[in-house]
Design a protein with these regions (language model features):
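An amphipathic alpha-helical core segment
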Residues: 135-189
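Alpha-helical scaffold segments that form or flank carboxylate-/histidine-based iron centers
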Residues: 39-55, 74-95, 162-165, 169-177
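Divalent metal-coordination and catalytic microenvironments
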Residues: 27, 54, 93, 148, ...
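Acidic, low-complexity proline/glycine-rich segments
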Residues: 13-33
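Histidine-centered metal-binding segments
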Residues: 2-15
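Conserved small/polar residues in nucleotide/adenosyl-binding loops
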Residues: 190-197
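All-alpha RGS (Regulator of G-protein Signaling) helical domain and cognate RGS-like helical scaffolds
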Residues: 63-71, 77-81, 85-95, 99-149
Length: 197
């Protein structure tokens, strides 16, 4: 089993870069119970989102990288250097692992330490950051991601369409919000703004 690390925020990329004996990326088990995000995200949504969508992105990445210069590259290198379908699928693999890992570490606690200081310095307060982050997700036209990225001591909210990923632009991701429809469409009573807050 081949694993590599890129150390991006909460995610070490070990999960992203785990491969089988044929050098194919593999879907790793979700690091928590599928129902543990309820009532915010339903078990059905987690099963479909993680088990179907993420699995499809992994499968597509494996097919598209086979026999190319990217075949033995870690996911973060594919994201930085590839384009088209390979970039889109590899970025979605990273984006989804990062998203689900962040949900695993999330909770009712406000950030502490250096992150808390940086949020205050860049946004005024944690509450101000949450409001701006949520607004960025609501304002994003179509599907995509909203990222909290860091460059030195500067934090930035970076709305990104489609599969865009901050690694491609040399940014360090700290947090993401998935605003693709598959993140919430299975429960009609869920509305995007409820999930973003």
């Amino acid at each position: 089993m081949n694993t590599e690390s890129c150390h991006c925020g909460l995610l070490s990329c070990k999960e992203v870069n785990t491969r089988d004996k044929d050098n194919k990326f593999t879907l790793q088990p979700l690091p928590y119970a599928e129902n543990s995000l309820e009532p915010y995200i339903s078990e059905k949504t987690v099963k479909f989102h993680y088990g179907k969508h993420l699995a499809a992105y992994i499968d597509n990445t494996n097919k598209l990288k086979a026999g190319t210069q990217f075949d033995d590259q870690p996911i973060h290198e594919i994201i930085k250097k590839a384009s088209g379908g390979l970039f889109n699928n590899a970025a979605q693999v990273f984006n989804h692992y990062f998203y689900f890992e962040a949900l695993h570490h999330s909770g009712a606690q406000a950030p502490r330490g250096k992150l808390s200081n940086l949020l205050e310095k860049n946004f005024g307060s944690f509450e101000d950051f949450k409001e701006k982050f949520t607004q960025a997700g609501t304002a994003l036209f179509g599907s995509g991601w909203v990222w909290l990225v860091q460059e030195d001591d500067k934090l930035e909210i970076w709305p990104a369409p489609n599969a865009e990923n901050p690694l491609k632009n040399g940014r360090y991701p700290l947090l993401t919000m998935d605003v693709w429809e598959h993140a919430y469409y299975l429960r009609s009573e869920e509305h995007t703004s409820e999930l973003q807050s």
